[in-house]
Structure formats: C-alpha cells, structure tokens
C-alpha cells in the first residue's frame, strides 16, 4: 500500500492522537528523581503515531495536544515548549519514510526509529525550546 501523508485515515489518526496526547499529558505523569520533573508517556504516543502516519501527523498530534493541555491546565500555552513538542514528533515522523510500518517490523526499523527519536528530542529540547524561550518570552540567556 502506498504511504500517504494526507489520507482520511491519517487525519482521523491525527485527531485521535491529539486527544490521546492531551489526556495523557494532563493526567499521566511518571515521577522522576529530578525535582519538579516528570516523565511524560504522551511523547511516546506522539512518536509512535508519527512513525506510523508520518511527520505531519506527528507534528500536529504533539502541537495540538500540548497546546490544548496547557490551555486547559494553565489558561494559556507556553508556546516555545508546544512548538518543541511538535518539532520532536515531526523529526520522529521522518522515520516514516525509512521504516516498514505494515507487517513485520525488523530490528533495523526499530534502530532507525530510535535514531530519529533521539535526534528529535535532542533538537527540540536542546535547541528549539531554549531558543524560543529567549525569543518569545525574553528569558535570560544562561550558558
């Protein structure tokens, strides 16, 4: 079957993924040993959907889900982190073009997916989020 970034199936999966991301982001938090920090299961969901349905779906799932979660929890989204969530899922979604998403998933497919996931997280949380915090919110540059 030909892969399509904009099929009806992909759009429905995007809507369901965004809703699932929002609920998990708001209510399912795994405590971490780092103070004031939790592990978010929602990012795994966005990465999975991105790998199966493509980078556009991944970006929209994480972006919309995170924005709605922030809006409902805090009254307004923290846009720099919302964009970073979307970018991390978008980069994970680039694996969509390199892996087999139908049938048996090989060890190579899992390795490729994990490389994209690590790159996506590194770029989003080490570059995009801090830079946008500085640009959008005028946060001080602390090197």
What function would you assign to each model-found segment?
Residues 1-143:
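Loop-helix junctions at membrane interfaces
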């Amino acid at each position: 079957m030909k892969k399509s970034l904009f099929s009806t199936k992909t759009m429905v999966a995007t809507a369901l993924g965004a809703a699932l991301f929002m609920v998990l982001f708001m209510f399912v938090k795994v405590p971490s040993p780092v103070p004031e920090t939790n592990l978010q299961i929602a990012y795994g969901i966005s990465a999975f959907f991105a790998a199966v349905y493509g980078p556009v779906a991944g970006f929209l799932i994480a972006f919309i889900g995170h924005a709605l979660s922030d809006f409902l929890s805090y009254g307004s989204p923290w846009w720099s982190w919302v964009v970073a969530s979307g970018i991390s899922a978008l980069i994970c979604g680039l694996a969509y073009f390199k892996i087999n998403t139908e049938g048996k998933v090989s060890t190579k497919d899992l390795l490729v997916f994990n490389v994209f996931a690590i790159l996506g997280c590194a770029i989003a949380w080490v570059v995009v989020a801090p830079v946008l915090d500085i640009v959008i919110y005028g946060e001080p540059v602390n090197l």
